[in-house]
Curated annotation (Swiss-Prot):
The keyword Mitochondrion does not apply. Residues 218-233 have a biased composition (Basic residues). Its main location: membrane. Keywords: ATP-binding, Cell cycle, Cell division, Cell membrane, Chromosome partition, DNA-binding, Membrane, Nucleotide-binding, Sporulation, Transmembrane, Transmembrane helix. Changing residue 467 to S: In SpoIIIE-73-11; defects in DNA translocation. Can complete engulfment and membrane fusion. ATP binds at residues 470-475. Disruption phenotype: Cells lacking this gene show a chromosome translocation defect and aberrant compartmentalization of both sigma-F and sigma-E, and fail to complete membrane fusion at the end of engulfment. This is DNA translocase SpoIIIE. The keyword Transmembrane helix applies. The gene is spoIIIE. It is found in: Cell membrane. It comes from the Bacteria.
Length: 787
């Protein structure tokens, strides 16, 4: 049923894509024919658009062209009522209105108006243009401009219509830019003001030098008159304070209102960037690999267990497979920013703390207020006011970052009323992602300032992801895997996935990047990790034979050897080991799993093997000290207590996160974590990417890396009392350590070992607290086995 549903969904999506492409091509064809005025059809469309927009008909044609390209490329109907587009409509309507006002001024001046009706005169001008009775007349703003002018002339007269058009242009600019008119004027006027000030100061310096030259020339001409120049000098001396007066007006620490940087504004500036597809290198088709003969000295190491040559026909998944972001306006949060800033300052003042809010960052999930304390104010004094500040702002909880790294300020993070969703597509579309060589670059989300947060897994080199159930941990892991699939081909990155929960990573079964099918049996997981350890040791043997130190050096060595000798030796791929739930593995085989993870985390970085370990139980018996010491990069989602936060990050803070993707990211080498709103990725998006990857290349699992079924083997019991103890327990049909101690007069340790050996061989059941163990072997069965 699931396959049928997936096929029907694919068929519907394909039909919808064809429909969008046809409509887009039709719009593009109409606009190009009309712009070039090709034949009768082109002239007809010109008349049609001139009727509506007059002399500005080209704007309609360009809009139709953009609409056609959008339908053809994005395969969806664009939203026509966004804030920016509403501003654009205001500007265009104002231009049409101004054009029509100017048209009727000219007609009135010439005396060409026969009727007082604006619409009728415009219609007559259009008919003259259609009939060709005169050279194509000026139609102003067309019929739209005529209707606007008729309404505005009735309400405001001609001059008032022009004023209203200018006001509408200003409103449109505010809507398009998303900034207040005051901010825009400040941005434009500040460089002009600086230029004028510099020129004025330069003019004052020139005047001073000119006056000093004049004084020196007068002294040389009249040396006998000494008093008069002295008087003049006294009159000229009071001028330098003008310079000081200029500097007194500058007070950078005094702000009437805090500077606000909005997350939504940053998103609109980055809206619909042009993403160029990476050009694949053009090369000849692969030839059959012939066994190398002769004394070739490329690699005389152990044989390659798994590597594959590049599939030239493989195409990377496009970003169009991911859903576009749906941003909320966060209008309520924007309105409350100034009020909250004043509340913070009043609260500080009431507790005798001199501090001022100077900058505010409106992020996706939280708003960060930058507070600059006065000289002599202790940081701890502000940190201790955490509960009082939360009470003043009526916030669920606040987090204080004291101080902000690189700034002499304290950050107060307040949850937003509306949480803006961050999509993986917008994170991967950022400029930071424009690095095709970084195969392990992963997208995490956006920080409070709205900047995309990406990280290179090979520089981490291992990652721990922990958080409570439902906090966004699985979505984060899916986002990391999808980021790698969007950037790397199967011969460049391989993956080993371990999923004891059996439902999170099963969707990736069949992708060509997998070394083995997703491991869902916890007993096989330790064996899979041991196979990765063996691969790491094999790689180090390769490095020692070739005289290289890491995977980058080895691959460069292979490239040089292939270029010089014409060989086809494949390069080593990176390996990413993903463990979705560490707690289950630690319950089944803690010692084996911990040993393998410890060895990999200590040594695997240079071999190109990287670990991503996720767990929803961040306790010390799961995230042991040995594991944590070797995994320096951590991501903490919302947890229930400060103890769990300290287990993950070695510091508090994660207990104050909001959930739903709100995380603290602590990269290697950083002193403090960065708060990030995680990128959301739906199940449908994951399925689309996986389907695309599978259609490009089928999975070829490596037999050496598939964990096998292991039969349990029991060593012989060396204790001579074992047979007698089994006979006693089967006869009594009850088993306990104390009974063996009494009957055989032995110590507790020896008796407990006998019971453990019986449990391994299925003679007795498991430990059940104060109750005696259940005897699983009947007396009749024992007699049969012994006879």
């Amino acid at each position: 049923m699931a396959k049928k549903k997936r096929k029907s969904r694919k068929k519907q999506a394909k039909q919808l894509n064809i429909k969008y492409e046809l409509n887009g091509l039709l719009c593009i064809a109409i606009s190009i024919i009309a712009i070039l005025q090709l034949g009768v059809v082109g002239q007809t469309f010109i008349y049609l658009f001139r009727f509506f927009a007059g002399e500005w008909f080209i704007l309609c044609l360009l809009g139709l062209l953009v609409l056609g390209v959008s339908l053809f490329w994005k395969k969806k109907t664009p939203s026509l009522l966004t804030r920016r587009k509403a501003g654009l409509y205001c500007i265009i309507a104002s231009i049409l209105l101004l054009s029509h006002v100017q048209l009727f001024k000219n007609l009135t001046h010439k005396g060409s108006i026969e009727s007082a009706s604006v619409v009728r005169n415009t219609w007559e001008l259009f008919l003259m243009d259609m009939n060709g009775s005169s050279a194509s007349p000026d139609l102003g703003g067309g019929m739209i401009g005529a209707l606007l002018f008729a309404a505005s002339h009735f309400l405001f007269a001609s001059t008032g219509s022009q004023i209203m058009a200018i006001v509408m242009i200003l409103i449109g600019m505010i809507l398009v830019t998303g900034r207040s008119l005051q901010e825009t004027l400040k941005k434009w006027m500040s460089p002009i003001g600086r230029f004028i000030k510099e020129q004025w100061l330069a003019f004052i310096d020139d005047m001073k030098s000119f006056k000093s030259n004049m004084q020196s020339s007068k002294k040389t001409k009249a040396p006998s008159k000494k008093q008069k120049p002295a008087r003049k000098k006294q009159q000229m001396e009071p001028e330098p304070p003008d310079e000081e007066g200029d500097y007194e007006t500058v007070s950078p620490l005094i702000h009437s209102e805090p500077i606000i940087s909005s997350f939504s504004d940053r998103n609109e500036e980055e809206e619909s960037p042009v993403i160029e597809k990476r050009a694949e290198p053009v090369s000849k088709p692969l030839q059959d690999i012939q066994p190398e003969t002769g004394d070739q000295e490329t690699v005389s190491a152990p044989p390659m267990t798994f590597t594959e040559l590049e599939n030239k026909d493989y195409e990377m998944p496009s970003l169009d497979l991911l859903a576009d972001p749906k941003h909320t306006g966060q209008q309520a949060d924007k309105k409350n920013i100034y009020e909250n800033a004043r509340k913070l300052e009043r609260t500080f003042q009431s507790f005798g703390v001199k501090a001022k809010v100077t900058q505010v960052h409106l992020g996706p999930a939280v708003t960060k207020y930058e507070v600059y304390p006065d000289v002599g104010v202790k940081v701890s004094k502000i940190v201790n006011l955490s509960d009082d500040l939360a009470l003043a702002l009526a916030a669920k909880d606040i987090r204080i970052e004291a101080p902000i790294p690189g700034k002499s300020a304290i950050g107060i993070e307040v949850p937003n009323a509306e949480v803006a969703m961050v999509s993986l597509k917008e994170v991967l579309e950022s400029k930071l992602n424009d690095r095709p060589d970084a195969k392990l670059l992963i997208g995490l989300g956006r920080n409070i300032s709205g900047e995309a947060v990406l990280a290179e897994l090979n520089k981490m080199p291992h990652l721990l992801v922990a958080g409570a159930t439902g906090s966004g941990k699985s979505v984060c892991v899916n986002g990391i895997i999808t980021s790698i699939l969007m950037r790397a081909k199967p011969h460049e990155v391989k993956m080993m996935m371990i999923d004891p929960k059996m439902v999170e990573l099963n969707v990736y079964n069949g992708i060509p990047h997998l070394l083995a099918p997703v491991v869902t049996d916890p007993k096989k997981a330790s064996q899979a990790l041991k196979k990765v350890v063996n691969e790491m040791e094999r790689r180090y043997e390769l490095f020692s034979h070739t005289g290289t130190r890491n995977i980058e050096g080895y691959n460069d060595y292979i490239k040089r050897a292939n270029n010089e000798e014409g060989a086809k030796q494949p390069e080593l791929p990176y390996i990413v080991v993903i463990v979705d739930e560490l707690a289950d593995l630690m319950m089944v085989a803690s010692s084996d799993v911990e040993d393998s993870i410890t060895r990999l985390s200590q040594m695997a970085r240079a071999a190109g093997i990287h670990l991503i370990i996720a767990t929803q139980r961040p306790s010390v018996d799961v995230i042991t000290g040995v594991i944590k010491a070797n995994i320096p990069s951590r991501i903490a989602f919302s947890v229930s207590s400060q103890t769990d936060s300290r287990t993950i990050l070695d510091m508090g803070g994660a207990e104050k996160l909001l959930g739903r993707g709100d995380m603290l990211f602590l990269p290697v080498g950083a002193n403090k974590p960065v708060r990030v709103q995680g990128a959301f990725l739906s199940d449908d998006e994951v399925e689309k990417v996986v389907d695309h990857v599978i259609t490009q290349q089928k999975a070829q699992y490596q037999e050496e890396m598939i964990p096998e079924e292991t039969t349990e083997t029991h060593s012989e019991v060396t204790d001579e009392l074992y047979d007698e103890a089994v006979e006693l327990i089967v006869g009594m049909q009850t088993a306990s350590v104390s009974m063996l101690q009494r009957r055989f007069r032995i110590g507790y340790t020896r008796a407990a070992r006998l019971i453990d050996a019986m449990e391994e061989r299925g003679v007795v059941g498991p430990y059940e607290g104060s109750k005696p163990r259940e005897v699983l072997l009947s007396k009749e069965k024992y007699d049969e086995l012994s006879s």
